[in-house]
Amino acid sequence: MERLTLPLGGAAAVDEYLEYRRIVGEDDGGKLFTPEEYEEYKRKVLPLRLQNRLFVSWRSPTGMDCKLVGPETLCFCTHRYKQHKTDLEAIPQQCPIDLPCQVTGCQCRAYLYVPLNGSQPIRCRCKHFADQHSAAPGFTCNTCSKCSGFHSCFTCACGQPAYAHDTVVETKQERLAQEKPVGQDIPYAAMGGLTGFSSLAEGYMRLDDSGIGVPSVEFLESPITAVDSPFLKAFQASSSSSPETLTDVGTSSQVSSLRRPEEDDMAFFERRYQERMKMEKAAKWKGKAPLPSATKPS
């Protein structure tokens, strides 16, 4: 692997370019703006972007946002969200709000999220993949003539089929009215529905109002059963130990369970294994120790 060496101040230049790319996105047409053009672009676009930001999500019938769309999220037309028209001078009055693709020759008229099955596109009922269909309205198959339009029975992690979901484009006010998170106002292009680090997770894993929500007190205080995670069962076993046992273990074992800075994965697990074997052997010999002899009466 070739090692890259940056000159003095090179790291700052890389950070400035990344900031430029996040703000400008695809609007420069592949040719960098001059400093004057860059400042003029920010003066003109950033106020509109902060005022008219659109939040895009893939929503289930239950109201949960199973997917929050970001700049790199693919559309049905196989182009990314950042390649669609996302900066509007005014919010359209009609619903739904269409965000057409800006790639030359693409027939996509509105951004439409389509999930993936692992790393592969999902299949239509005609047995062909989503990317084998036309991006024009109607979404007919390019491979067969019997397909009347893309329709997939793929099941989302929320338990609902893909065809029951909708790609929702909404304003900040509409999202606040539903008590869904909107995050902070940021100048970056095509942020879609991303409001924080948790937005990268799927809806059933997010514990905010856009996902499955905060667990109830009854759920958090429910007893741990055999169907729960092994980590929870191990925690229950350690927390239910008697105070005497915890005192006997002491702080040495707690320190021993921490990884040392110079240890890799194999060395850490090997050391923990040897310590466990040593403890088991000591406990075994302790159990075999002879009982103290009783004094016979004279």
From Swiss-Prot:
<dbReference type="InterPro" id="IPR026755">
    <property type="entry name" value="Fam221a/b"/>
</dbReference>
<comment type="similarity">
    <text>Belongs to the FAM221 family.</text>
</comment>
<feature type="compositionally biased region" description="Polar residues">
    <location>
        <begin position="241"/>
        <end position="257"/>
    </location>
</feature>
<feature type="region of interest" description="Disordered">
    <location>
        <begin position="241"/>
        <end position="263"/>
    </location>
</feature>
<dbReference type="Pfam" id="PF14753">
    <property type="entry name" value="FAM221"/>
</dbReference>
<protein>
    <recommendedName>
        <fullName>Protein FAM221A</fullName>
    </recommendedName>
</protein>
